[in-house]
Amino acid sequence: MAVSFTITYKDESTGARLGLLYTPHGTVETPVFMPVGTQATVKTMTPEEVRDIGGRMILSNTYHLYLRPGHELIREAGGLHRFMHWDGPILTDSGGFQVFSLGPLRKVSEEGVAFRSHIDGSEHFFSPEKAMEVQMALGSDIAMAFDECAPYPCSREYALAATERTTRWARRCRTAHDREDQGLFGIVQGGTFKDLRERSARELVELDFPGYAIGGLSVGEPKQLMYEVLDYTVPLLPEEKPRYLMGVGSPDCLVEGVLRGIDMFDCVLPTRIARNGTALTRQGRLVVRNAEYARDFSPLEPDCDCYACRNYTRAYIRHLIKANEILGIRLTTIHNLYFIMKLMEEIRAAVRQGRMLQFRDDFLRKYQGD
């Protein structure tokens, strides 16, 4: 099997666990956060820098790479790892979320989704088979099944149709996927409806994927509602297989997700807010572009050991961002990803020492300013 998973420790008082995810490009300790490299790059950072701050596995985006430069070109280059010079594991999403986010630019049928490119308006069609073809050409370590991500809020009727279609498409993905050095994960849908989540999980578990994602969350619903959905969805998934919460990456959600038994996360949040001049700190978000930091000669976070905090001040980084200098974005990106990687390291240590609940309380008290 291309991808396998071993649980190395289970916390007795919570759902948290530690594990090892084995892939063709190396073994990763879980829980793990995957920085997002949408266009085959973690924005502004070299692969070496991503590795230096603790990144071990990244996510790349099937929809974007299919449109530009094209999956055949990447296959010709020797696959995504060689193309982007990243030798660690890569997970590719299926493109489903992006295609369904296109709104009026897309048309859904049982066969798949017809859509217009957001780049040049050209017409395309994604089916489960096409999503598999593209991801097999990219050569990621883990591919994702093509699913229908229902928006929030949505009617029960819509969520039911999307859940049923997700199962049918998952079967077609299973049939079409035949790359032996690539694992294929299924995605549980069902919106915020408990019975639909149960049904989706049951049907996907029957298909026996090597790992399972929980999709359709972090799409605008309140965090408390997301935690409730996790509380009743995670126990439905096979304990011995990795569980991946898609698109979730704010520090508080990472802590709460691990407590509930999630092993894998990805999110654009740390890199996206960095480009808006916002830094993650233990005390919450710091909007360094604000005028109050113009004469602040302290680092983004005083106790942080990242390259940005060791060498530069808030005043300087603010100046760079206000002047639209790329270095400003690079420094906030380096800091934010370092912050998340350090957090994951601390979470793993807390789980190992059986103090995850205490860690959650201490972390959130500072982070949320309670």
Curated annotation (Swiss-Prot):
Output the InterPro entries linked to this UniProt entry: ArchSynthase1/Queuine_TRR, TGT, TGT-like_sf, tRNA_ribo_trans-like
Organism superkingdom: Bacteria
Question: EC number(s) for this protein?
Answer: 2.4.2.29
Q: Name one GO biological process term.
A: tRNA wobble guanine modification
Residues binding Zn(2+), per UniProt: 304, 306, 309, 335
Query: Keywords, A to Z?
Result: Glycosyltransferase, Metal-binding, Queuosine biosynthesis, Transferase, tRNA processing, Zinc
Instruction: State what this protein does.
Output: Catalyzes the base-exchange of a guanine (G) residue with the queuine precursor 7-aminomethyl-7-deazaguanine (PreQ1) at position 34 (anticodon wobble position) in tRNAs with GU(N) anticodons (tRNA-Asp, -Asn, -His and -Tyr). Catalysis occurs through a double-displacement mechanism. The nucleophile active site attacks the C1' of nucleotide 34 to detach the guanine base from the RNA, forming a covalent enzyme-RNA intermediate. The proton acceptor active site deprotonates the incoming PreQ1, allowing a nucleophilic attack on the C1' of the ribose to form the product.
| Name the UniProt record assigns to this protein | Queuine tRNA-ribosyltransferase
Organism field:
Pelotomaculum thermopropionicum (strain DSM 13744 / JCM 10971 / SI)
Q: What is the lineage of its organism?
A: Bacteria, Bacillati, Bacillota, Clostridia, Eubacteriales
